[in-house]
């Protein structure tokens, strides 16, 4: 059997908005884009639940998260930096 190459995992940069859970943080990732009709620059955000083994992150910290296998019902990301 031949091993299949795994595709590159997605990496996103965001800010920690909650650290109240054990080994889990909520990271808000913002993206900006031009509105298709009006051309105005619009900012949209999305929250991701990420695994944080060390538990040393504080609210407001800037982190990188990487896609991973499902760790729970909501967690599909882990903190890498």
Swiss-Prot record:
Gene3D superfamilies (UniProt xref): Nucleic acid-binding proteins (2.40.50.140)
Top-rank taxon, per record: Bacteria
Keywords tagged on the record: Ribonucleoprotein, Ribosomal protein, RNA-binding, rRNA-binding
GO MF terms, alphabetically ordered: rRNA binding; structural constituent of ribosome
GO CC field: cytosolic small ribosomal subunit
Biological processes annotated in GO: translation
Classification via InterPro entries: NA-bd_OB-fold, Ribosomal_uS17, Ribosomal_uS17_bact/chlr, Ribosomal_uS17_CS
Pfam families attached to this UniProt entry: Ribosomal_S17 (PF00366)
Similarity annotation: Belongs to the universal ribosomal protein uS17 family.
Subunit structure comment from the entry: Part of the 30S ribosomal subunit.
Summary of the function given for this chain in its UniProt record: One of the primary rRNA binding proteins, it binds specifically to the 5'-end of 16S ribosomal RNA.
Listed NCBIfam families: PRK05610.1, uS17_bact
Protein name, UniProt field: Small ribosomal subunit protein uS17
Organism in which the protein naturally occurs: Protochlamydia amoebophila (strain UWE25)
């Amino acid at each position: 059997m031949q091993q299949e190459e795994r595709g590159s995992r997605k990496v996103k940069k965001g800010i920690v908005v909650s650290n109240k859970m054990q080994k889990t943080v909520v990271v808000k990732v913002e993206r900006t884009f031009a509105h298709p009709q009006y051309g105005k620059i619009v900012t949209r955000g999305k929250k991701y639940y990420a695994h944080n083994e060390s538990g040393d992150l504080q609210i407001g910290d800037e982190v990188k998260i990487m896609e991973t296998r499902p760790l729970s019902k909501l967690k599909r990301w882990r903190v890498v930096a």
